[in-house]
Swiss-Prot record:
The keyword Iron applies. Is able to transfer iron-sulfur clusters to apo-ferredoxin. Multiple cycles of [2Fe2S] cluster formation and transfer are observed, suggesting that IscA acts catalytically. Recruits intracellular free iron so as to provide iron for the assembly of transient iron-sulfur cluster in IscU in the presence of IscS, L-cysteine and the thioredoxin reductase system TrxA/TrxB. InterPro entries: Fe-S_cluster_asmbl/transfer, FeS_biogenesis, FeS_cluster_insertion, FeS_cluster_insertion_CS, HesB-like_dom_sf, IscA_proteobacteria. Binds 2 iron ions per dimer. The dimer may bind additional iron ions. Fe cation binds at C35, C99, C101. Gene3D superfamilies: HesB-like domain (2.60.300.12). This is Iron-binding protein IscA. GO terms for biological process: iron-sulfur cluster assembly. GO terms for molecular function: 2 iron, 2 sulfur cluster binding; iron ion binding. Its cofactor is Fe cation. Homodimer; may form tetramers and higher multimers.
């Protein structure tokens, strides 16, 4: 099982954590949402819970709760700039379908 970050995603997360002044790492998870059923959740984590799994890639700790892990295994997180827009992009091999707006997915 693994989660990987591109160089640009690792740099962006590291910058956010440095500007925040504290934090253990980045929590990556899923929640029920949207027309396809699931959406990604990104938030800072100051301390992992006992049932969390922690991955480290390029110096960044990525924390995933036990329920989300099965849906996120093998995911790569990237940070992209497209025109005036920028944001995190997920490449998840478990996704079977996405909604038209790209806000949610189904596994």
């Amino acid at each position: 099982m693994s989660i990987t970050l591109s160089d640009s995603a690792a740099a962006r997360v590291s910058s956010f954590l440095e500007n925040r002044g504290k934090g253990y790492g980045l929590r990556l998870g899923v929640r029920t949402s949207g027309c396809s059923g699931m959406a990604y959740v990104l938030e800072f984590v100051d301390e992992p819970a006992t049932d969390d799994t922690v991955f480290e890639d390029k110096g960044v700790k990525v924390v995933i709760d036990g329920k989300s892990l099965q849906f996120l295994d093998g995911t790569q997180l990237d940070f992209v700039k497209e025109g005036l827009n920028e944001g995190f992009k997920f490449t998840n091999p478990n996704v079977k379908d996405e909604c038209g707006c790209g806000e949610s997915f189904h596994v």
